[in-house]
Structure formats: structure tokens, C-alpha cells
Amino acid sequence: MYESSPWKEDLKRRRQLLLQYNTKEHFEKDEDKAYTVIEKAIFYSAFIIRKLLDCNGKMSDEADQYAIKVTEWKPTRKITVMHRWPREGKFDWEEGKTKNVLGNKVCNWLIHSFVFLTEVNEDGTIGSFFVSSDYDKNKVAYQVEISEWEKYMKFIETDWVVSLHSHYDEKKQDYVFTKKERG
């Protein structure tokens, strides 16, 4: 990635679409369109964020270490192509475990998702999403609040490195960044 600005601008646009379409009015007007716009905003933002983080020197140390609160749910049945939706009876909804995970991990889960489903609020808007990668599908599903994901998107889109410290590592035969300061 040569320049991060266009990617961050696209991320901002995806975040704005997520906020714009996750309203009672949009769901009442055209539920399929609202859901599709939000789903695409979530998946596209995961790819953009992951790409930005993978390009050494483009994001600050704070962005690399940004943590998101998630809730883990254990499956009670084997998750397969025919049985992969987190409905009642497939997960232990009584024993959720809340923890903080790196945002980059959530991006990986989304990019490699086997399970993806949203939780709808009483007003018809999306409150959270459930995701499990192809690797974790029979171990855990993670629930991420939409508000947490939106905050993460905003943090990344406004992350600008103002100071960079690096040195050449003979063993790696490449430069290693030791400090990337956020401005």
C-alpha cells in the first residue's frame, strides 16, 4: 500500500453507511437493502483495517494494540454447512464470557468467517454480530457490538503516524519498526 489516505477515506465512508442504514426507518423502508449495506460495511471495513495494519509503518502502535470487547459463546452442537446459524440450541446462551481481543483478530475472524449472523434490536436495528472463523467454528462464536465495531473503525480512520522509529535487522534482512507514534 503506497498511501493510506484513500483506504482510510473508504473506511470512513463504510462507517458512515453503517450508521446511516442502521436505523429503524431504513429497515422499515427496505430491510434487505439496509442489511446488505451494513453487512458489506462490516466485511469491507475488516479487509481495509487488516490491510492497513499489515502494511508496516502505516498505523500507530495504538492501532496495532487496539482492543475490542467481545463475548464468547460455546457451541452445543457441531457447526456444519447445514447447521451454522447461531440459533437457540446451537450455542450455550447461558455461559457467555466477555473479554478484550485485538481488533486485528476480529478482522481475521470476519475475513475467514464460517459463521456470521446479526442480532436485531427490538426496534429492528442491528445491535451486534456473531462471527466464527472456519478454524474456530466448533470452538466458539464471538459476539461484537455494532457500537464497538464502529468505534474501532473511527479509531483506525483517524490514526496517523507522526513519528516512526526503525532499525535494520540483519536476521530478518529488513527494517523493523520499534515505535510508531499516533498524532
Label each region the model flagged.
Residues 1-43, 47, 54-183:
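Acidic, Ser/Thr/Gly/Pro-rich intrinsically disordered interaction regions
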